[in-house]
Design a protein with these regions (language model features):
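Gram-negative outer-membrane beta-barrel transporters
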Residues: 12-130
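C-terminal beta-signal and adjacent terminal beta-strands/loops
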Residues: 121-132, 156-208
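Short, contiguous acidic/charged loop-to-helix segments that flank catalytic cores in large enzymes
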Residues: 19-21, 89-93, 137-145, 190-191
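Flexible hinge/switch segments at interdomain interfaces of large molecular machines
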Residues: 6-8
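Strand-connecting loop/turn motifs
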Residues: 45-49, 98, 109-113, 147, ...
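Membrane-topology and secretion signals of cell-surface/extracellular proteins
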Residues: 1-4
Length: 208
């Protein structure tokens, strides 16, 4: 597997990539989807099919590094270096989160030719780049916890003068989730943090 690693090149710290010797990944995924109808309720509710859909994935990984394994990095001048200096044996695969979940709540209205969905995604902590070193002198890995992101999508089809049109509204990151990359060695050290912002997009399409 290809992994990002932080290396010192002269007086600068740079990110490069290397091939980890070996990794094992295992996991379990569960998914469910159900529509609900409420015929005896008010028209706004009874005209629609209400959707509940969820997906959850648990995964675990293990990177294996032996004594004789070598890698070539940006700062090594093309010479093979000990892989164990850059990757800790038994550590989690870079970019892999233990928990990934998705929840969708929405409705579909065939009469009004419309649908709306709230989409909640959650991703737990993951490694974004390796810290190099040996023993207690090893630089902590760079970590990120994407957290929860909530989006809303609305679509409606309609006809004007015999022409089929489609309207779409998309609202992204309603919870205002930020990006944060950090190291942990006793205390949390922020490496990179910024506001992802919230966005909205509107589109109108014509079908020919």
């Amino acid at each position: 597997p290809v992994e990002a690693v932080i290396v010192d090149v002269g007086n600068q710290r740079q990110q490069t990539f290397l091939n980890a010797p070996e990794a094992t990944v295992m996991g379990v995924e569960a998914e469910g989807k159900k529509y609900f109808e409420f015929a005896d309720q008010a028209a706004f509710i009874s005209n629609k099919r209400w959707l509940v859909q969820a997906n959850y994935t648990w995964s675990d990984s293990d990177v294996s590094v032996g004594e004789g394994d070598t890698v070539i990095t940006l700062g090594g001048g093309g010479r093979p270096e000990q892989a164990s200096f850059f990757i800790q044996d038994g550590s989690r695969l870079q970019g892999q989160s233990e928990h990934v979940a998705n929840l969708q709540l929405g409705w579909e209205d065939d009469t009004a030719r419309s649908q709306a969905t709230f989409i909640l995604n959650y991703v737990s902590e993951r490694i974004t780049a390796r810290g190099a070193g040996v023993g207690t002198a090893r630089e902590p890995d760079y970590l990120q916890e994407p957290g929860a992101v909530l989006d809303f999508v609305y679509r409606k089809d309609f006809t004007v003068k015999g022409r089929d049109l489609g309207f779409a509204l998309e609202l992204r990151n309603l919870l205002g989730t930020d990006f944060e990359e950090y190291q942990e060695k006793g205390n949390k050290i922020r490496i990179n943090q910024y506001d992802l912002g919230q966005s909205a997009s509107v589109s109108l399409t014509a079908r020919f």
